[in-house]
Amino acid sequence: MNFRAKKATVLIMALSLLTISYGQTSVIKGVSPLDELPGYIKRVTYFGQRADFSHDGKRILFLAKTFGDVYEVELETGIIRPMTHHYFHEGYTRALYLANGDILLSGARHFDANDPWASRSEKNAELWVLKKDLSGPPVALGEKCSEGPAVSRKHMRIAWTQGGAFYMADIVYKDGKPELAGKRKILDGRDLPFKAGLETQNFRPPDEKELIFSAYDYQGTEVMGLDIETGKVVNYSKAPKQYDEPEGIFPDGRYTLVECDKHNRKGTQYIDIYKLALDGSARTQRLTFFSNYDGYKASNPVVSDDGRYMAFQVAERGDVAGVGRGILIFDLKSYEKAEKQHNHKSAESSMSSGRLSSMNL
């Protein structure tokens, strides 16, 4: 076993001991999780939030801050380039790659430093398309959006929330200018048998016939799926009094990443990243342990198109939802290897204990 693999396995074992049972998580004080990163996690930037992988997995798009500029980091070289410095604007709250490589932005036309959060509301945040060649300013699509839109990774299709309802449309180009076509309402929150704040998250691969979304303040917060054609809604997290917010989805559609407080149930300021099965079992697996460190949390994860890597952000307790303090890369394959080694060692230890107990009978 090489040093990095050994370090990863040791950390998994240590963190597992810290979280053996609900309600007994030990708090690590006086140190940052960034000081004790396992071999399968690497810090990419020292600022920024809301990462999004390019389709080839070589670059990550991110915001400098809420209502800030958009940047892109090249993972191989670490080179960061600005994407929105070539024109004046009022700042953005979302930036996502479209299927053709252009960028979908969400941001208001006006920003007031004395009332900043108004620019994030659905009354003011608009959707725009910025061409990948950065040949000019973005073009407004004529729609306002509550929080984050869902963007297809395969088609020029988006879904968004407005007025407690979900809408879907295709982005088409006429004379080189993007616009929406075929807009239709796919869900009205008033038709649901429960009350919740709604937000679109992802089209579920591989066929993208289902939309994964958040149901805020329903039984805590639940991960839901909407069959786009039939309108059927499924609860995938099924965890009352627990916070489960869907984030990045795996390319095979079998799992989604979630921000979750299952380990302590203290709410959004104590979240970490989990992997949730979308087979109806509500099975979860914890991937990060940043909230074990006093004052920290991990959030806003996304998955690369090949399913190999996860990008996420570090944040501090007290930060507003979505705020990040740097982007990190999580090697999912390396993690799985380290986890298997840990499980193998645990099994060997259990077998040895059993043999010793038998000998003492």
Descriptions of predicted regions:
Residues M1-V10:
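Bacterial N-terminal signal peptides that target proteins for export
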Residues Q24-L361:
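Sequence signature of WD/YWTD-type beta-propeller architectures
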